[in-house]
Amino acid sequence: MRLILIRHAQARCNILEDDALMDAYDPHCELTEAGIGQAVKLRDEYPVSLTPSVIYSSPLKRARETAGIFRGRYPSVPFVEDERLSELKAPESFIPPITQGQWDLYLEQRIRSPHLEIVKGLESLDVQRERIERFYKDLFRKYAEEACNIVIFTHAFSIQLSILFFLGLGNEQLLQWQIKASNTAMHIIHYDPTSGSFLLESLNNRSHLQTTG
């Protein structure tokens, strides 16, 4: 079984200036024109050897839009949205509004104190990790007997936590090192259900974005 984890393409909420005001966490943030171009390149240059057996996606709009463009090449492949692939859960509104810089600080604090809800309604890193682990455990049970390629569209933190889970490492490792998760980059992992072992074959693969023409 191969897992192909892909971060969504560039979205408007990814390019905010540090002093930009946020009155809410935006799950409906749309792709930029550059992001649409990234998703098109991913679709067109995606390796035939990794043709998907099934496609999973976070329900957040930026992930769904990326998956939707990708699926243009694979319209008959089963598609599943799973809430457990969402980015962190956050308050419906910030009163008073916060800046993008303050939001980034909250994300750093989640790493330093993974068991804490930094602000009311902001999901802790540990809770996020737990739901992602549940997703994979269910996935492995469902496809344990199949030689398949499973494409998963999700978010940067979800990819970080997924890889920690595959390696059997705790969230505290994020204080020491992190794995870059660029927009539309592929992280390819082979899973052997017999031994329960993982092999990281490629991380943050952006080769499709290097093509010209």
From Swiss-Prot:
Keyword Nucleotide-binding among record annotations: no
Keywords recorded for this protein, A-Z: Antibiotic biosynthesis, Hydrolase
Active site: H8 (tele-phosphohistidine intermediate), H155
InterPro entries: His_Pase_superF_clade-1, His_PPase_superfam, PGM_Phosphatase
Function: Catalyzes dephosphorylation of 5''-phosphoribostamycin to generate ribostamycinin the biosynthetic pathway of butirosin.
Short name of one Pfam family: His_Phos_1
Recorded metabolic or biological pathway in which this protein acts: Antibiotic biosynthesis; butirosin biosynthesis
Signal peptide positions (record): none
Hydrolase keyword on record: yes
Disulphides: none
GO biological process, one term: antibiotic biosynthetic process
Gene Ontology molecular functions: phosphatase activity
The family this protein is said to belong to: Belongs to the histidine phosphatase superfamily.
Source organism, top-level taxon: Bacteria
Species in which this protein is naturally found: Niallia circulans (Bacillus circulans)
PANTHER family in the cross-refs: BROAD-SPECIFICITY PHOSPHATASE YOR283W-RELATED
Annotated EC: 3.1.3.88
Name of this protein: 5''-phosphoribostamycin phosphatase
Residue numbers marked as site, Important for activity: R62
Recorded catalytic activity of this chain's protein: 5''-phosphoribostamycin + H2O = ribostamycin + phosphate
